[in-house]
Amino acid sequence: ELAKLHAKPSALLFSSAYVANEWTLIALSKIIPNIVFLSDSKNHASLIQGILHSNAPKMIWTHNDMSDLEEKLKKAASLNLVPCIVFESVYSMDGDVSPILSVCDLADKYGAMTYIDEVHAVGLYGTTGAGYLEMLGIQDRVDIVNGTLGKAFGVQGGYIAGDGMVIDAIRSVASGFIFTTSMSPVICSGALASIKYLKDHPELREQQQLQVKKLKHKLNKVGVEVHPSACTHIVPVMVRNAERAKRMSDELLNEYGIYIQAINHPTVAHGEERLRIAPTPFHTDAMISDLVEALEKVFKNVD
């Protein structure tokens, strides 16, 4: 079902998307001689750890900077290394999106492999909920897709999808897949039901995007700063002070019954602290109005 969702020949389940990322990258370093990982500077910790633990050479390219990525690809070619571009579709802290088409064009130009993390996109984008690649109509242009069953699908676990031979090779050498307990039939059944349900209910994705637009509009109207790069369902409200962000989060919960997680260093840089909001299709207009009103008061009351 996951392979079908991503229009790939094969898929492989892991205990989490973190484990899937980490051990797939480690496995690729064992399978492909002379591989070099070209990693976006804002990649998730699981991707970073996978690259570090692989002991393969790496090059870090400036976030979403295609000129820098191309320079790294040229360098990899000059060293006779096999490049694997590692990036995400939706970045969870800023709520921005990678220039996926441009990345794929560069990959084609330099013969690079592509590995994309769609954790914050699966279930939420695309005709059937397969993510940003499906929404752009380019599922065939990325080699390996990583996704999660624990966010939009609301269950547990992670996976990769890709070419059958590549997935079989990863299955054979990824210790994080081989030497751990498999997902239980109950969890698999729940995930399968959720995947099928979201495939058949695109109106939920449409409703979520509508509620996100309403929230951003209302926040802008009252002068609450949203990260300027945010263009997805992730709405980062900028606070820029760790202690204040924590106090604001506490007051929202204690005084208004609204839980919003404060995001501090090392997840984001010092001075970039924020409250991260992700509206769902089931957050009503009244709930959004209450949230904005509460945020406006908390920004005034909490120093």
What are these regions (language model features)?
Residues 2-23:
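Short loop-beta-helix segment that forms the pyridoxal 5′-phosphate
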Residues 4, 254-255, 267-303:
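PLP-dependent enzyme catalytic core of the Aspartate aminotransferase-like
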Residues 16, 38-54:
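Substrate-binding/gating loop at the entrance of the active-site cleft, primarily
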Residues 24-45:
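Conserved PLP-anchoring active-site segment centered on the Schiff-base-forming lysine
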Residues 59, 63-116:
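Active-site phosphate-binding strand-loop segment of PLP-dependent enzymes
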Residues 110-113, 120, 125-231:
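Active-site C-terminal subdomain of aminotransferase-like
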Residues 205-216, 220-257, 265, 271-272, ...:
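Conserved PLP-binding catalytic core of the aspartate aminotransferase-like
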